[in-house]
């Protein structure tokens, strides 16, 4: 788990040049101050985490349990509640604001997000299969996955077989990304 974390929104992408005149692709994030709503500890909750919110939301547009949760903590209601699993939460208090400067000091970050959904994809796109021959008798099977299992024994396809299906729209993490600039 992490020592520090923060929630942000992807705005877009751009590029910058480094000292050797190499182009670096850069993802631009909007990171609003995150307000701590609840501190979850190992002793009380069984795991350590921070529950944070960001942005603003009218209390009239919330359910009563949500509004009560914010009222009990004394924190202004935000757009979403997000839980950040951390190793040590002793240094955090309810109502504390987390800003991007705390994360930017480290220089490197791990980014977790939901990947782009690509819908139902074939085996070649989804798993990088090579496909079948383009000629020499191949008939309408050029992008097919090929054989998927054995014959009478075991009379089934083993679990985990790479086949066509939904691609993307899954939680994914990229490790050790460089922080280029934070303001």
Where are these regions (language model features)?
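Extended basic (Lys/Arg/His-rich) segments that typically form rRNA-contacting surfaces
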Residues: 1-183
């Amino acid at each position: 788990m992490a020592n520090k974390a923060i929630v942000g929104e992807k705005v877009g992408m751009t590029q910058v040049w480094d000292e050797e005149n190499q182009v670096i692709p850069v993802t631009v994030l909007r990171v609003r101050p995150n307000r701590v709503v609840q501190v979850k500890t190992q002793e009380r909750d069984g795991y350590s985490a921070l529950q944070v919110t960001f942005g603003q939301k009218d209390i009239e547009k919330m359910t009563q349990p949500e509004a009560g949760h914010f009222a009990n903590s004394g924190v202004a209601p935000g757009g979403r509640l997000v839980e950040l699993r951390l190793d040590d939460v002793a240094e955090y208090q309810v109502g504390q604001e987390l800003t991007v400067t705390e994360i930017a000091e480290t220089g490197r970050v791990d980014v977790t997000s939901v990947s782009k959904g690509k819908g139902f994809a074939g085996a070649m796109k989804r798993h990088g299969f090579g496909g079948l021959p383009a000629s020499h008798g191949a008939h309408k099977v050029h992008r097919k996955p090929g054989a998927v299992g054995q014959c009478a024994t075991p009379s089934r396809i083993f679990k985990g077989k790479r086949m066509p299906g939904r691609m993307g729209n899954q939680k994914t993490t990229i490790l050790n990304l460089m922080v280029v600039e934070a303001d």
